[in-house]
UniProtKB/Swiss-Prot annotation:
Protein's membrane topology: Multi-pass membrane protein
Gene: nhaB
Keywords, comma-separated and alphabetical: Antiport, Cell inner membrane, Cell membrane, Ion transport, Membrane, Sodium, Sodium transport, Transmembrane, Transmembrane helix, Transport
Organism whose genome encodes this protein: Actinobacillus pleuropneumoniae serotype 3 (strain JL03)
Primary location group: membrane
Localization annotation: Cell inner membrane
One Pfam family matching this protein: NhaB
Catalytic activity: 2 Na(+)(in) + 3 H(+)(out) = 2 Na(+)(out) + 3 H(+)(in)
GO CC terms in record: plasma membrane
GO molecular function term, any single one: sodium:proton antiporter activity
Entry protein name: Na(+)/H(+) antiporter NhaB
Residues that span the membrane, as ranges: 21-41, 64-84, 88-108, 119-139, 143-163, 202-222, 243-263, 299-318, 322-344, 350-370, 389-409, 477-497
KW Ribonucleoprotein (keyword) present: no
Family designation: Belongs to the NhaB Na(+)/H(+) (TC 2.A.34) antiporter family.
Length: 513
């Protein structure tokens, strides 16, 4: 084997050859487009290529191919290293969240697995169980960040999967085995596939639930805080102003959840196999029998840490990541986890994704520097006031499907604020536009993992390949929710928001500044 073959073989490891060739082609083509055709076209090509690397997440983790494309983009001048740093610092809260909050949830896994195992064993109806997961995620994400909620659900799902996988592989609950290795599973393969389908559906219901809750409050999503800040709204006012859109969407989202389970379409409807239920019930019974006073105290500490988590985030007592760090300290200190290697394991899951997010911010910097969204923004602001709400919603939704909704929301609200300060739009129109931007970035963005950081985290988590949740599968399973949420959001924005906002203003519930 000559050196060139050796380099090609080691390049991107076990990724398919056609995929490696694609990435090399992108790296060759991008500078040519940038220098000889158009920087604008090159920018959109980079966005499309980055989306491609995300869609192939199960073939190769997107950090390496996406990172190479991002490095080249900076090198050829599509953006600067300084601007990348500015984007990272502007979104530093998200990085802290990924580093510390997800690791903090790791130390609450014992309590979460106990509670959700009870839920799984007690609730036999798949419809009710799906509804419970969806509404739990909705409620939690209204007060916590949606990414934190998904981290909780992933932690629980991994626990369930690990318990059954060990037994199906012929091991006991206590054995330490590789749950990604199916070689020892011979007779239980069909049951395992059904269990995977069951977990996929629960996870997607919860993921959409996190978006339903995230749109409702100013702490639900990072961009909500930015929008609330620009509009000068408090927690209650934000909730009331968005309610004419968020409430009908929530009701229709819940109905969609039940209908999908009833008709068993779009990958939903898989029931928990009876044998798996038996294993989980046996595991739960064994755990309860072996539970010592010390175990109960540990779960009590984790419960108190959970209460602090909800209160701290709901009242915004500190940045999300800082609260996550306090969770790590409290849980490890009072549960006796002082070994650095044991603590280090909690960071194994979030760190690759944190690195990927930084690469993503590089792409965002390219979008800003090359003004890729500027033609769309100019078109929307030049439209007549009656059409502006619909256009803001539609274009926010479309761009949020391919780009980060935090970025899209921030760009649009800043442009709307500039238009207000320039007297292009009235204050009343600005308030309505702010709601359109909030709902436009949060609702249609469930269509793809690109738009919501929580969805992207789920797709690139180690749990996704275990349950065979690919990019295409996520698109397919999110499709009915995307259609319902987007249409109901649009209709509510057009026909309910203006009259109900005026009504609440007349009642004195909200004020026009």
């Amino acid at each position: 084997m000559d050196s060139s073959n050796a380099i090609f073989k080691s390049f991107l490891g076990k990724a398919p050859e056609w995929y490696k060739i694609c990435i090399i082609a992108f790296l060759v083509i991008n500078p040519l487009i940038y220098f000889f055709i158009s920087p604008f076209v090159a920018g959109w090509a980079l966005v499309a290529e980055f989306i491609f690397t995300l869609s192939m997440a199960l073939k190769c983790y997107p950090l390496q191919p996406g990172g190479l494309l991002a490095i080249e983009a900076v090198f050829i001048g599509m953006t600067s290293a300084h601007h990348v740093k500015e984007e990272i610092m502007a979104n530093f809260e998200v990085i802290l969240l990924l580093m510390f909050m997800v690791a903090g949830i790791y130390f609450m896994k014992q309590l979460l697995l106990y509670v959700f195992t009870k839920l799984l064993i007690v609730i036999h109806s798949k419809k009710i169980l799906s509804l419970a997961f969806c509404l739990s995620a909705t409620f939690l994400s209204a007060f916590l960040d949606a990414l934190t909620v998904i981290a909780v659900i992933i932690s629980v799902g991994t626990g369930f999967y690990g318990v059954y996988h060990k037994v199906a592989s012929g091991n006991s609950f206590e054995d330490s085995t590789d749950i990604s290795n199916d070689e020892k599973i011979i007779t239980n393969k069909e049951i395992l596939e059904q269990f995977r389908a069951f977990l996929r559906s629960l996870l997607m219901h919860a993921a959409v639930g996190s978006a339903l809750g995230g749109v409702m409050t100013m702490v639900g999503e990072p961009q909500n805080l930015i929008i609330a800040g620009q509009a000068e709204w408090g927690f209650v006012e934000f909730l009331l102003r968005v309610l004419p859109v968020s409430l009908p969407v929530l009701i229709c989202g819940v109905i969609t959840c039940l209908l999908l389970e009833h008709f068993k379409i779009f990958g939903y409807g898989a029931r928990l196999p009876r044998r798996v239920w038996g294993v989980l019930a046996r595991y739960n019974l064994l755990k309860e029998q072996r539970m010592t006073q010390q175990d109960r105290v540990k779960m009590g500490i984790q419960a108190l840490a959970g209460i602090w988590l909800v209160v701290g985030l709901a009242l915004h007592l500190a940045d999300v990541g800082i609260i996550g760090l306090t969770i790590i300290i409290i849980c490890t200190a009072f549960c006796g986890i002082t070994d650095e290697h044991a603590i280090g394991r909690s960071f194994q899951e979030p760190m690759p994704f944190t690195a990927l997010i930084v690469v993503f911010f590089t792409v965002v910097a390219v979008i800003v520097d090359l003004k890729l969204f500027e033609p769309i923004i100019s078109y929307v602001l030049s439209a007549d006031p009656h059409s502006q709400l619909a256009l803001f919603y539609v274009f926010n939704g479309l761009l949020s499907m391919i780009s980060d909704n935090v970025f899209v929301g921030t760009v649009y609200i800043n442009e709307a604020k500039t238009a207000l300060e320039s007297a292009i739009i009235s204050r009343e129109q600005f308030d309505l536009i702010a709601v359109a931007i909030n709902t436009g970035t949060n609702l249609p963005s469930v269509a793809t993992p690109n738009g919501q950081a929580a969805f992207l985290f789920l797709l690139t988590s180690p749990f996704a390949p275990l349950i065979r949740l690919s990019y295409g599968k996520m698109l397919y399973m999110a499709l009915p929710y995307t259609i319902v949420l987007s249409i109901i959001g649009f209709l509510s924005l057009e026909f309910l928001l203006p009259p109900l906002t005026e009504l609440m203003s007349n009642w004195g519930w909200i004020i026009t500044r």
